[in-house]
């Protein structure tokens, strides 16, 4: 009998999830064939053919593992030997408390690591239908831009309608075209993050009159029309800037243009009415992206409208914004707890196609799918992460934590989800104890302690699940309640 331990597992899709899945499989000692169509067929959003290309922001969001759910999942992925987080750490650029990367260096590093791994074979080809059963165990991680043929095959197999929404891309501009006589460097609340200085963002201030003129221009700007197949809702976590403006004139002041925690270095006594932040986009510091400024405005409109922002009147854009479609399946109905398709258990799904949202979330589900597939190939039962971990919480949401009801008016449907503390199980009663000497303990202080306790529990349980020891960082030790 053939030793199935040494027969390869196939992974379809070389994005963040597929790359992570392939790495986890190979690091488990199982050969893997990674199929990626870019290089043969492109997409509407990708620019090149490297693996794990970042098409939206260059930020993996907060790296604070003490009281931020995203930082917790970063830390858990590091414990699990994540390729994506390792390459992000290696190619990070200053971004306050966030983990942001040089996008080209990052994706090239992922590509090199996989192509040079002795158990990984990268095949550049489009998979146009469901993988044949002869392939055996297969992970489908084709992401938000799944090719039409494969999407149709998945729909035919599942009998479920595919759901789609839009991810929006923010503009990127050249640093030397920014007027620093108006703008200034500062991270919000002067926060120092990994590789940062507390002055990692370029800030563009607006007074009330400038803000209102800008809002009017955003709302009046022509947008790119939708195709018939794109008639689906936006994901609230990635709304185009003009859609946010249409929802209320003050929406942006309480969102990506909020002025809190920022002091104009050129005029410190005058509080800005609104602030546009620019975040470093590459290691050289020559490119900056407009934080939260994803848009569907026409290219001809974007440059004119965004040059209305003080300090950007002569801005030169390396890339203008745009939108692309995102497709995902009804995972709670279709997948089992180890991410297998119930109707075809030889197939697993991973990444954004499962209904998670965000770079690290996609990669983390790829990490789990890869570990599950490798264990199964070696004749072992997949070890599921504890529900108290970030990995376990996200897995639970995808495979059954979502609530739906057929008999309630306006029933809730499965929606993409970022990792957040709302997905974690509650602490045991009595876990939150008022510190000695504190008279009033509620509100923000109590919330911070709760998050710290949930984060600490998650990392402890994750380390135990993986069978590894974890040494807390100095930052985490200082934050321990």
UniProtKB/Swiss-Prot annotation:
The name this protein goes by in its record: Methylenetetrahydrofolate--tRNA-(uracil-5-)-methyltransferase TrmFO
Q: What does this protein do?
A: Catalyzes the folate-dependent formation of 5-methyl-uridine at position 54 (M-5-U54) in all tRNAs.
Locations listed in the record: Cytoplasm
Is Electron transport given among the entry's keywords? no
Lineage in the entry?
Bacteria, Pseudomonadati, Pseudomonadota, Alphaproteobacteria, Hyphomicrobiales
Q: Into which family does the record put it?
A: Belongs to the MnmG family. TrmFO subfamily.
Keywords, comma-separated and alphabetical: Cytoplasm, FAD, Flavoprotein, Methyltransferase, NAD, NADP, Transferase, tRNA processing
- What is catalyzed by this enzyme? uridine(54) in tRNA + (6R)-5,10-methylene-5,6,7,8-tetrahydrofolate + NADH + H(+) = 5-methyluridine(54) in tRNA + (6S)-5,6,7,8-tetrahydrofolate + NAD(+); uridine(54) in tRNA + (6R)-5,10-methylene-5,6,7,8-tetrahydrofolate + NADPH + H(+) = 5-methyluridine(54) in tRNA + (6S)-5,6,7,8-tetrahydrofolate + NADP(+)
Q: Name one GO biological process term.
A: tRNA wobble uridine modification
**Cofactor(s) the protein needs:** FAD
The record's GO molecular-function terms, alphabetically, read: flavin adenine dinucleotide binding; tRNA (uracil(54)-C5)-methyltransferase activity, 5,10-methylenetetrahydrofolate-dependent
Under the heading PANTHER family, the entry gives: GLUCOSE INHIBITED DIVISION PROTEIN A, METHYLENETETRAHYDROFOLATE--TRNA-(URACIL-5-)-METHYLTRANSFERASE TRMFO
Supply the HAMAP family for this chain.
TrmFO
Q: A single GO CC term, please?
A: cytosol
Q: Which organism is it from?
A: Agrobacterium fabrum (strain C58 / ATCC 33970)
Q: Which residues bind FAD?
A: 13-18
Known EC number(s)? 2.1.1.74
């Amino acid at each position: 009998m053939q030793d199935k331990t040494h027969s390869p597992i196939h992974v379809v899709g070389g994005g963040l999830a597929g790359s992570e899945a392939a790495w986890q499989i190979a690091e488990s000692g199982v050969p893997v064939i990674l199929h990626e169509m870019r290089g043969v067929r492109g997409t509407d959003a990708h620019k090149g053919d490297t693996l794990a290309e970042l098409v939206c922001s260059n930020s993996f969001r907060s790296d604070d593992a003490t009281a931020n759910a995203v930082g917790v999942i970063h830390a858990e992925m590091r414990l699990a030997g994540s390729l994506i987080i390792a390459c992000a750490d290696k190619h990070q650029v200053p971004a306050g408390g966030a983990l942001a990367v040089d996008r080209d260096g990052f994706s090239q590093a992922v590509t090199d690591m996989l192509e040079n791994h002795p158990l990984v074979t990268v095949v550049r080809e489009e998979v146009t239908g469901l993988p044949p059963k002869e392939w055996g165990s297969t992970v489908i991680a084709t992401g938000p831009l799944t090719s039409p043929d494969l999407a149709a095959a998945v729909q035919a197999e599942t009998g479920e309608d595919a759901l789609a929404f839009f991810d929006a891309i923010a503009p990127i501009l050249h640093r030397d075209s920014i007027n620093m006589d108006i703008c200034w460097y500062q991270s919000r609340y002067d926060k120092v993050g990994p590789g940062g200085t507390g002055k990692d963002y370029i800030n563009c201030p607006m007074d009330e009159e400038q803000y209102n003129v800008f809002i009017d221009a955003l709302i009046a700007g022509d947008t790119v029309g939708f195709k018939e197949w794109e008639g689906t809702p936006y994901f609230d976590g990635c709304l185009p800037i003009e859609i946010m403006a249409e929802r209320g004139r003050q929406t942006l002041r309480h969102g990506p243009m909020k002025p809190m925690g920022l002091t104009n270095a050129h005029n410190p006594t005058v509080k800005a009415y609104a602030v546009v932040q620019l975040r470093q986009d590459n290691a050289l510091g020559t490119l900056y992206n407009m934080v939260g400024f994803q848009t569907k405005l026409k290219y001809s409109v974007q440059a004119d409208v965004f040059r209305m922002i003080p300090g950007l009147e002569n801005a030169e854009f390396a890339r203008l914004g745009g939108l692309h479609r995102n497709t995902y399946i009804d995972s709670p109905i279709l997948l089992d707890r180890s991410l297998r398709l119930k109707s075809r258990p030889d197939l697993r799904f991973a990444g954004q196609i499962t209904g998670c949202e965000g770079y690290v979330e996609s990669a983390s589900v790829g990490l789990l799918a890869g570990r599950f597939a490798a264990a199964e190939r070696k004749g072992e039962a997949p070890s599921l992460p504890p529900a108290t971990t970030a990995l376990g919480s996200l897995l639970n949401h995808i495979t059954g934590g979502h609530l739906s009801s057929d008999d309630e008016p306006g029933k809730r449907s499965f929606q993409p989800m970022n990792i957040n503390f709302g997905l974690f199980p509650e602490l045991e009663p009595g876990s939150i104890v008022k510190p000695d000497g504190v008279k009033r303990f509620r509100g923000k202080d109590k919330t911070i302690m709760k998050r710290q306790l949930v984060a600490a529990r998650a990392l402890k349980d994750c380390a135990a699940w993986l069978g590894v020891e974890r040494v807390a960082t100095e930052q985490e030790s200082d934050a321990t309640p």
